[in-house]
């Protein structure tokens, strides 16, 4: 992930202002250590910190159209850029960067081109012909982005809060699936799929449709000009990503450049569930597996850095971000610049253990909708910023637009958890990849129970965090918590501890308002807490809080596999510019 910063219409074109923009842009250099760029046109500034993943030699930013009247700075990957270039035959491209198409698409179609992009992105585009600008963020919010306003009438854009919090009177999270246009004078929603209105869909479950859609999502993300790998915890989601990647890597441009054997990475405390399962899956798939161990003290020592980089005080996010943060540093030290990760499946398929309590399919579906819409505040934030802290890019195939639309059009009855019928959480996904003739995964991995990342790395990790917080936050501090922190008042010592650190780095009221709050149990939304009366007094975000559902063992012995597996899909047509895509 790159880092972008823009200051637009600040009524100051002085050298001092340029120096200030450069200074603020350097706060984002961890995201893009490969190159820095700054474009100035009057009182408009576009800065870029580049992580070179596509076309490292010539793709430096900002990028331009032919006559350089349109300028764009982008953080993202446009997976269909080759297809889009074919639609822009009258345009001359200067680089091989996937992001250059944005300037030309705007020139050809105006502001409404954003839905044509298939990828993850945040960008700022300046049209010097009339001094107008637009800003856009991807559909789900995989890339992080903030918008702020100065007292001088300026508009500020930054990949991270730390790029603008000291210079803006007010700032907020830029909403996913929207663009902001100076011509329109505000935001416009460009991503509005049918499932957004939360009405219950009725498409029958077709396992092969799910399989094809997800394989396509993984394959298109193999577009890279640098070494890459997969994050492999040994759970269902990361294991499927690894399995599909391993199957389709051969013959791609990436394999020709970096070799056909996939590298996988796992992190955990000694003896943790993830380390054991990750190693087993890696051996099954034949990956070059890298296992990273950390201690509870290692994690505690990193908490301040994690909060500074991830920019949140949300308990669940910090718990899970810390091991990912530590692992990302190790991965980058090996020369890897991009990883595939498994975020998003639990939101789409109702994979969290509390979904066992969903009273009906309408409630189940509406909760998945709420969870997906909030992903940019939680797992997307974690995956993006804990990796970007070390100049590592995370790609998340479960959050592919086409795949989400396929999965969210299903009748939610098929997603509901019914253990008596052998249907555990994410059953429809497991069933889609249960192939007897060409198995994707061993059965007990395919049907391994859900572990939240912060649990799977080792149960003593969360217990250690709670103990450490208790040593730093006393009862008197908790009794005054509502006065000290009237917004999102911390209700545990662990939450109070994180909040104190956050406020040191980001003391502005705008900053604290960017962090979500409300009742939760086992990662639920506040609405889902109503599903079980016993949850109202148990506000632990850990998956273990789903009392009566969580199994500490993960060997699959408690799962009834009563559903016959699918037959292999033979002789499916495949095509892709740099690899293969399975056509539906």
Swiss-Prot record:
Recorded catalytic activity of this chain's protein: L-aspartate + L-glutamine + ATP + H2O = L-asparagine + L-glutamate + AMP + diphosphate + H(+)
Gene3D superfamilies noted in UniProt: Glutamine Phosphoribosylpyrophosphate, subunit 1, domain 1, HUPs
Any one Gene Ontology cellular component term annotated for this protein: cytosol
Pfam families to which the protein is assigned, alphabetical: Asn_synthase, GATase_7
EC number from the UniProt entry: 6.3.5.4
Catalytic residues identified in the record: 2 (for gatase activity)
Pathway(s): Amino-acid biosynthesis; L-asparagine biosynthesis; L-asparagine from L-aspartate (L-Gln route): step 1/1
More about this protein: Plants over-expressing ASN1 have increased content of free amino acids (mainly Asn) in flowers, siliques and seeds.
Annotated function: Essential for nitrogen assimilation, distribution and remobilization within the plant via the phloem.
The protein's name in its UniProt record: Asparagine synthetase [glutamine-hydrolyzing] 1
Organism from which the protein derives: Arabidopsis thaliana (Mouse-ear cress)
Gene name tied to this protein: ASN1
């Amino acid at each position: 992930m790159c880092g972008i910063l823009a200051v637009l219409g600040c009524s100051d074109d002085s050298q001092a202002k340029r120096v200030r923009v450069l200074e603020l842009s350097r706060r984002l250099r961890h995201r893009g250590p490969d190159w820095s760029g700054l474009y100035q046109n009057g009182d408009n500034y576009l800065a870029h910190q580049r992580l070179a993943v596509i076309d490292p030699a010539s793709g430096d930013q900002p990028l331009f159209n032919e006559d350089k009247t349109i300028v764009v700075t982008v953080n993202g990957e446009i997976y269909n850029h080759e297809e889009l270039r074919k639609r822009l035959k009258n345009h001359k491209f200067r680089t091989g960067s996937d992001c250059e198409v944005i300037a030309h698409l705007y020139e050809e179609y105006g502001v409404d081109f954003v839905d044509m992009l298939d990828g993850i992105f945040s960008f700022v585009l300046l049209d010097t012909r009339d001094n107008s600008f637009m800003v856009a963020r991807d559909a789900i919010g995989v890339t992080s982005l903030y918008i702020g306003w100065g007292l001088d009438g300026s508009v500020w854009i930054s990949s991270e809060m730390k790029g603008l919090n000291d210079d803006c009177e007010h700032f907020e999270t830029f909403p996913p699936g929207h663009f902001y246009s100076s011509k329109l004078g505000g935001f416009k929603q460009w991503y509005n799929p049918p499932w957004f209105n939360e009405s219950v869909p009725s498409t029958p479950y077709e396992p092969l449709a799910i399989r094809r859609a997800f394989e396509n999502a993984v394959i298109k993300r193999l577009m890279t000009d640098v070494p890459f790998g997969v994050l492999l915890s040994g759970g269902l989601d990361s294991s499927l990503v690894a399995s599909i990647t391993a199957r389709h890597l051969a013959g791609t441009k990436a394999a020709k450049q970096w070799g056909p054997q996939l590298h996988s990475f796992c992190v955990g405390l000694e003896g943790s569930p993830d380390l054991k399962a990750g190693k087993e899956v890696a051996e099954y798939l034949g990956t070059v597996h890298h296992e990273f161990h950390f201690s509870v003290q290692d994690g505690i020592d990193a908490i301040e850095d994690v909060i500074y980089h991830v920019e949140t005080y949300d308990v669940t996010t910090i718990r899970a971000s810390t091991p990912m943060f530590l692992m990302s540093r190790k991965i980058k030290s090996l020369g890897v610049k991009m990883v595939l990760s498994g975020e998003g499946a639990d939101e789409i398929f109702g994979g969290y253990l509390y979904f066992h309590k969903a009273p009906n399919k309408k409630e189940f579906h509406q909760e998945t909708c709420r969870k997906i819409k909030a992903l940019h505040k939680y797992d997307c934030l974690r995956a993006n910023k804990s990796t970007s802290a070390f100049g590592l890019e995370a790609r998340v195939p479960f959050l592919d637009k086409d795949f989400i639309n396929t999965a969210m059009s299903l009748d939610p009855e098929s997603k509901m958890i019914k253990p008596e019928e052998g249907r555990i959480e994410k059953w429809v996904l497991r069933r889609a990849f249960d192939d007897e003739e060409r198995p994707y995964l061993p059965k007990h991995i395919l049907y391994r129970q859900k572990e939240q990342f912060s649990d799977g790395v080792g149960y003593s990790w969360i217990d250690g965090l709670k103990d450490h917080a208790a040593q730093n936050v006393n009862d008197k501090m908790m009794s005054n918590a509502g006065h000290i922190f009237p917004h999102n008042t911390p209700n545990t010592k662990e939450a109070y501890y994180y909040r104190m650190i956050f406020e040191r780095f980001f003391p502005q009221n705008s900053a604290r308002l960017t962090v979500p709050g409300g009742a939760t149990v086992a990662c639920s939304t506040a609405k889902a807490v109503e599903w079980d009366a016993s949850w109202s007094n148990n506000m632990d975000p850990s998956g273990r809080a789903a009392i009566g559902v969580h199994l500490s063992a993960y060997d699959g012995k408690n799962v009834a596999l009563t559903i016959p597996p699918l037959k292999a899909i033979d002789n499916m047509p495949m095509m892709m510019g740099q690899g293969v895509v399975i056509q539906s």
